[in-house]
């Protein structure tokens, strides 16, 4: 009897957790595919597209990468830890996927610090991790505010010790769209390439 009571409590707790995370997460708990990262399929709280210039000035949208899984990361080139670590993890993940699968993945680095991240600097920094990676730079403050609001990304300038210096505090996570352009995953930083490889394989199958 006691075991049954605890069983009911456990099941109720699980269902409440799924309900709290949203109906789309509940579906993800019950149906394949079983992602290792947070499944946000169907969650309308996040943006579904973007229109941002790349380092050559060409405006890119999700439609430019039709047929590819798209990884969208928000960061900045002067970032001391999270940003280069995430880019390195993604670079390693593509190597582990193999060349054929890697061609079907597009990594986008959206700067939250366009003041310092000039097209030239961004154009050197991002492809250094992998030649296929693309840097996107909001053209002005309004465009930066729009894309970060659409994807619920936090960012703030933090003054440094030296006069005029600063760092950027920002959401340390990535968004992943599937090959049909649907937003599917929210990926927190610092997990290593393993979960990336696992989930990208599911999206590419």
Regions found by a protein language model. Name each.
Residues 2-18:
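Bacterial N-terminal signal peptides that target proteins for export
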Residues 50-70:
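A short beta-strand-turn-helix
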Residues 30-32:
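Bacterial signal peptide processing site
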Residues 25-28:
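C-terminal motif of bacterial Sec signal peptides marking the signal peptidase cleavage site
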């Amino acid at each position: 009897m006691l075991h049954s009571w605890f069983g009911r409590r456990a099941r109720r707790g699980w269902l409440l957790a799924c309900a709290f995370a949203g109906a789309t997460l509940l579906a993800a708990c019950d149906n394949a595919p079983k992602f290792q990262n947070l499944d946000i399929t169907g969650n309308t709280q996040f943006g579904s597209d973007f229109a941002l210039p790349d380092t050559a000035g060409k405006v890119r949208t999700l439609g430019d990468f039709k047929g590819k899984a798209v990884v969208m990361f928000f960061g900045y080139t002067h970032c001391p830890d999270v940003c280069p670590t995430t880019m390195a993890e993604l670079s390693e993940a593509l190597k582990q996927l193999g060349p054929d699968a890697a061609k079907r993945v597009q990594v986008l680095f959206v700067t939250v610090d366009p003041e310092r991240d000039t097209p030239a600097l961004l154009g050197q920094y991002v492809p250094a991790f992998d030649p296929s990676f693309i840097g996107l730079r909001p053209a002005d403050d309004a465009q930066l505010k729009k894309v970060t609001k659409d994807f619920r990304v936090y960012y703030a300038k933090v003054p440094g010790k030296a006069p005029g210096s600063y760092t950027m505090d920002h959401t340390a996570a990535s968004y992943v769209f599937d090959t049909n352009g649907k937003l599917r995953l929210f990926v927190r930083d610092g997990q290593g390439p393993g979960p990336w490889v696992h989930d990208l394989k599911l999206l590419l199958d």
